[in-house]
Amino acid sequence: MDSQRNILLIALALVSFLLFQQWQVAKNPAPQAVEQAQSSSSLPAPSFADELDPVPGQQQASAKTITVTTDVLTLSIDTVGGDVVHADLNQYSAELDSSDPFVLLKDTQGHQFIAQSGLVGPQGIDLSSSNRPHYNVSADSFTLADGQDELRVPMTFTANGIEYTKTYVLKRGSYALNVEYDVANNSGNNATFGMYAHLRQNLMDAGGSITMPTYRGGAYSTEDTRYKKYSFEDMQDRNLSINLADGQGWAAMIQHYFAAAWIPRNEPGTNLYTRVIGNLGDIGVRMPNKTIATGDQAKFEATLWVGPKLQQEMAAVAPNLDLVVDYGWLWFIAKPLHSLLAFIQSFVGNWGVAIICLTFIVRGAMYPLTKAQYTSMAKMRMLQPKLQAMRERIGDDRQRMSQEMMELYKKEKVNPLGGCLPLVLQMPIFIALYWALMESVELRHSPFFGWIHDLSAQDPYYILPLLMGASMFLIQKMSPTTVTDPMQQKIMTFMPVMFTFFFLFFPSGLVLYWLVSNIVTLIQQTLIYKALEKKGLHTK
């Protein structure tokens, strides 16, 4: 067992696994949710999709849009229906060094991603896409003033003796906004309504690049399922319809770093649904009906999140909403690593420096495993002459050879798996840290120093990948080897080149982590080898 072969093969397996997992996320992000839909409640889940136009007619032309501005959001709201048709994230730029804000929601030629809400039911005013209410507003723009913590944007509509007030409530520093319907029934008859709220987006392929694909599609949460993706492909295959028996859950459209989500107000019997109309996909919630007697009033409300994937803030808005920051199956390791990274950054003030500090902490914590690995391999190397003599003496008798090898290991107190086991135990930490860095919106457009202006983007001059490849080459040269096969030697020599090519396209934050990890490996390797030599365990 030699360290060079083990380290590089494990690293190759790790990168291959991560690339394959990312490809799987993009191509087949979630299995069909049939079983989950059936298990979410013993109650039937009637499909809300049947209430609205199965094939909507011509969408109404907008009478006008109003602009709503806070410190973190700039929204455009269509006065026809009162939908959010545009959302700028004021504190996130569209591109590095750009003054233009990142646009999350928009309704443009060829691309639609909007947040719709309305009232349906027997007396619903939003049942037809071609006959939605035209709301009246007191101004064309609303702005959160200095010293003001809350901004209310009321829109009114009256029909058949019923007064409707749809109000958007936004708060300073928050990406969560409330949508409230206040309905006053003076029609002389009972009126029944239920509120719906969904996100609509063009069906499209997953985002990202070939080397770093990212998920773009639907996701939801119920009492039985904390978090589940429901891709555009899933929506096209089957409309989702889940009854939320306790009313808790949410429906979202997510993409790399950002998300939009509707959260109902914990009303038992809420229906979570998807539907596809042409090239558009909807995912949302439909709250149960309320009957309003004449002369009475009622309120309907839901919360809309539109912004970056900020775990702490999202967790405060709704249970499990923070899980849209998807760390994969090793989330229980990745989440604490991200928290530690953010904690370090709060002191050092630079995400690149925080990554370096975190790498030293992680590798320091794994030092006992690393030391055990090199010690075991040194002991195995000391046994090579005895093992070779044993092979020559026994010949092709594999059973006898195996028995005598085990006796030799027992006599010399050597664990033949000691060199591999520490590497296997380290792999989950490496994978979890990869996802923690990959999913952190905080790294987006965050500079390190010099030529690295964005840790979430690839190195523009490929300096970090080249340094990383050089560090792998040094590790390979410093590691003693027992490989004698010429083909294996060529493969081992070629591995740093192959890894360098892979990392040319990786975000520089990830490459920085791997480079620093290799440097720490070189330091630890040198110290461990010197200590082993003093003990008489030769490493060469």
Curated annotation (Swiss-Prot):
Residues 36-63 are annotated as: Disordered. InterPro entries: Membr_insert_YidC, Membr_insert_YidC_N, YidC/ALB3/OXA1/COX18, YidC/Oxa/ALB_C, YidC_ALB_C, YidC_periplasmic_sf. It holds the Pfam family YidC_periplas. It is found in: Cell inner membrane. The keyword Glycoprotein does not apply. Keywords: Cell inner membrane, Cell membrane, Chaperone, Membrane, Protein transport, Transmembrane, Transmembrane helix, Transport. It is a multi-pass membrane protein. The chain crosses the membrane at residues 6-26, 342-362, 417-437, 455-475, 496-516. GO terms for cellular component: plasma membrane. Residues 36-47 have a biased composition (Low complexity). One of its GO terms (molecular function) is membrane insertase activity. GO terms for biological process: protein insertion into membrane; protein transport. Required for the insertion and/or proper folding and/or complex formation of integral membrane proteins into the membrane. Involved in integration of membrane proteins that insert both dependently and independently of the Sec translocase complex, as well as at least some lipoproteins. Aids folding of multispanning membrane proteins. Interacts with the Sec translocase complex via SecD. Specifically interacts with transmembrane segments of nascent integral membrane proteins during membrane integration. Belongs to the OXA1/ALB3/YidC family. Type 1 subfamily. This is Membrane protein insertase YidC.
